[in-house]
Amino acid sequence: MNNIIDGKALANEILEDLKLEIQELKSQTNASPKLAIVLVGDNPASIIYVKNKIKNAHKIGIDTLLVNLSTTIHTNDLITKINELNHDNEISGMIVQLPLPNSIDKNKILSAVSPYKDVDGFHPLNVGYLHSGIIDVSEFSQSFIPCTALGCLAVIKKYEPNLSGKHVVVIGRSNIVGKPLSALLLKEDCSVTICHSKTHNLGSIALKADIVVAAIGSPLKLTAEYFNPESIVIDVGINRISGNKIIGDVDFEHVKSKVKYITPVPGGIGPMTIAFLLKNTVKAFKDSYSTVCHL
């Protein structure tokens, strides 16, 4: 169906542009962007995500460093390792793959990553800049915005260029998607309603929306009754079920024919998240050279 949004195709366009930009940057600086990925433990899903990030990074000319640590590592020891990467001038950007083991203080770890290398956009300084309205999606800003939120916004603007006044219902309040995306949509002059698992009358709220973003983490939770024929549906859910199959928060098979546009899972927002992670990494590289190379 032509109303199904091909996130992989959109992501590939971004990656091709980044590949050309990296080639130009390398000719100017004789260096390449480098992304450090800190992975604690051997969570199968995390390993798959990390491999995809590394594969796409190498495809466009971004070097990577994978730091794989044992689940027995203590919070302070992990912070020490992160500080080493903070002070490594070859590292442009850094992410800590989530989730972390329960024994590790996630907030301390995310705060330990230098805000200037925080290409996931999770450092409290970057979070504060976004929600205070100080920064926007401009690549001239020296702060970072969470990649999934950027990917969602890019998809939404592709299919609804004039967002001013649109009613967007964001279902989910995480720091990774719901909160940052809501902040970005407010900057686009949308009327944003944030819902979550405790929201009453969720169906009637979503039904009135122009755009619905599903990021609630509940497989196939949103059925056709939640949407109107003009709805644009962005499904951010990644839910693993039997046989390692991945499904979204939206009942895709029964919803796709009832709405204007919809993203599939997989193949929707996932590839866009990786594309914007790598875009943030290139931005971090340019920021680190800007004072001496005038990039």
Curated annotation (Swiss-Prot):
Reaction catalysed by this enzyme: (6R)-5,10-methylene-5,6,7,8-tetrahydrofolate + NADP(+) = (6R)-5,10-methenyltetrahydrofolate + NADPH; (6R)-5,10-methenyltetrahydrofolate + H2O = (6R)-10-formyltetrahydrofolate + H(+)
Binding positions for NADP(+) per the UniProt entry: G172, R173, S174, S197, I238
Keyword Transmembrane helix: no
InterPro entries: Aminoacid_DH-like_N_sf, NAD(P)-bd_dom_sf, THF_DH/CycHdrlase, THF_DH/CycHdrlase_cat_dom, THF_DH/CycHdrlase_CS, THF_DH/CycHdrlase_NAD-bd_dom
Keyword Transferase: no
Entry-linked NCBIfam families: PRK14171.1 (NF010768)
This protein's name: Bifunctional protein FolD
Taxonomic lineage: Bacteria, Pseudomonadati, Pseudomonadota, Alphaproteobacteria, Rickettsiales
UniProt gene name: folD
